[in-house]
């Protein structure tokens, strides 16, 4: 794939994505199955038409109905036996040309509307171009490179898009599409999530070019939908009201606000007009009940009078409201004052929930959807058999054949790196199945903790003093064994309550105890105190804090205490372990910096909050210590706006820490989807170069830019059941695939670096978009796998390289720094970080880390 910016063609050099340098050979071969199904495509040209539908603001579902009706209606004159496929927007493909003039043709189509009224549409169809699947074969076999992709060239002319539309046409008519997945209403199963939401199961389907062939990627998927039910019931679920008839009083303000937040933006249909089930979108909930909410009603004589909603429904529909004390829904446009009593409305079926799930809903969702690998494999196979693609008339029209067995792939299990610990006996740990153990080992570099404090935000009743004493004794014992001795008793140990007491207490500690190294904070479950502790510690005062849930203080376990020590040692400047130096790839022979970058976006439907960009960089040769930079930027912007200055900061810090200038920069970029590769690479690669040149005009280290993706639907299964690992029967940690299901000629690979605990492991996908350092496949795959073993929070290999993981933690922590005490009700379950009326400067300042914290791994 070529990269070009959106400027005029030729104004900027085209960035050519590197070709695959060869295949990896390291590791023990393993036979795998992938949830990819081969699609045989004929070597023909297909015909692309542009479809223009007026009115043009219709949802795709309506557009599809219009086009479907048009094909039926104009069968004799235009379409004959042809079965066109349509993408729901502007593109229509046919296997044979249509008899329409080059200028196009305008057609009138009507759909039956609600309540017997017809809905008229005007449709124009115009020939655009032929799309060649000959060429696709040439590209897939690597015989020809595709022509450089011009950024302004429409996706519809892309032959892969045409294949996708053919395979999507029928399911789009039968099911509810969401992104690349299809869902249908639950039949015979019921998975309520609470709060008016439920789980719908469906499947993901996407077409991807692979080596020598096109593959159809099929996976089972699940998402949250709103339950189709009366609005009164929806309200009861949201507000935890068990019996509406026992609520004779109007809603409290807090109840009304909560209900409004949940129902705003949803579609409802009315039930008081017989078969006329008119639909409306909710824009608000009234403050007043139906018995008091008035609106101006125009009488037949032209006079306007004020009527309450309850009166109006009694007079007009002879309907005595059962719940006149409840508020009304305001629907349609705010300024139009259309009010509906709750009791005449139902939630429209098939609305996907895009709002963030609560913690309870998320855990219910995971329980309902987690499948062991063998179960998922079986489910996907069943799905493909029942989809019966070869019987799909549109698939037949374009002469496709879809195989119904999974692709056989040979992967390799890479060897795990050994990890060097410290202490007198300098033990080495060898991971087995992605896990190792710290028992009998001491940190590579342990910190001695001489001055420390405890602040307990749980009540004295929850956590008595002797419980605290027991906890600190246990912690000191474990920490001594780990080579991080905590000396003596804490210099300060007090109970406190509420987020407001955090600042004053921390200030007192900072001023009273010079040389204080750590504050251990005990929290009573989910609480706004956490955000305030991190805001005060990380940004205002520069003090190291370690939070512990009170349940883990009351009931200590060696595992929990040991995990606490892993975090504390690193926050105070220690090193837990390092990769054994002699087995590291050759890239370590010269100074190299590893960068990890991520952008986290606010939850859907939250227009006000900024996106947060984080970049971390390694600060030593192991690499074990990292330094962080973080910025706020425009909501939903994927490109890291301020990357040049962030990388510059990290390069300066690297030089201060090591006295070397890196000769290589390895950049792991998380969270970019395929559609954004081009513009993100173009902007960010130049930003990294700019950072280097701003330090010295001839400083040009080699840059390798790798995108890490976890959000994809490729799953790998062991073909041989004896190779399955663990209770959930997954592929072993270290499984790598770079053939068959990967890109025809670009440098990408799948690596499952972690041991699956629950459900089916998802391998991470790595795509090299730039490589000045000329890595071989083996070198880069091994380097990536080794970096997955350097994550300090646990003694297991994680699913993405440590620098990418740390960037994610830094961005996530910044959300807490943005929680504004004055404006936010920082409800435990939702880190809000609202930018309520705060200007960009204030937001930027809120995420700025204190000078004393900047050099530490405060995010661990």
UniProtKB/Swiss-Prot annotation:
Keywords: Cytoplasm, Endonuclease, Hydrolase, Metal-binding, Nuclease, Ribonucleoprotein, RNA-binding, RNA-mediated gene silencing, Translation regulation
GO terms (BP aspect): miRNA-mediated gene silencing by inhibition of translation; mRNA catabolic process; pre-miRNA processing; regulation of stem cell proliferation; regulatory ncRNA-mediated post-transcriptional gene silencing
Residue sites binding a divalent metal cation per the record: 598, 638, 670, 808
Organism (species): Gallus gallus (Chicken)
GO CC annotation terms, alphabetical: cytoplasm; cytoplasmic ribonucleoprotein granule; nucleus; P-body; RISC complex
Compartment(s): Cytoplasm, P-body
Stored InterPro entries: AGO3, ArgoL1, ArgoL2, Argonaute_Mid_dom, Argonaute_N, PAZ_dom, PAZ_dom_sf, Piwi
CDD domains: PAZ_argonaute_like, Piwi_ago-like
All copies of domain PAZ, residue ranges: 230-349
Pfam families associated with the record: ArgoL1, ArgoL2, ArgoMid, ArgoN, PAZ, Piwi
EC number: 3.1.26.n2
Molecular function via GO: endoribonuclease activity, cleaving miRNA-paired mRNA; metal ion binding; miRNA binding; RNA endonuclease activity; single-stranded RNA binding
Protein name, per record: Protein argonaute-3
HAMAP family: AGO3
Domain Piwi: 518-819
Keyword Ribonucleoprotein assigned: yes
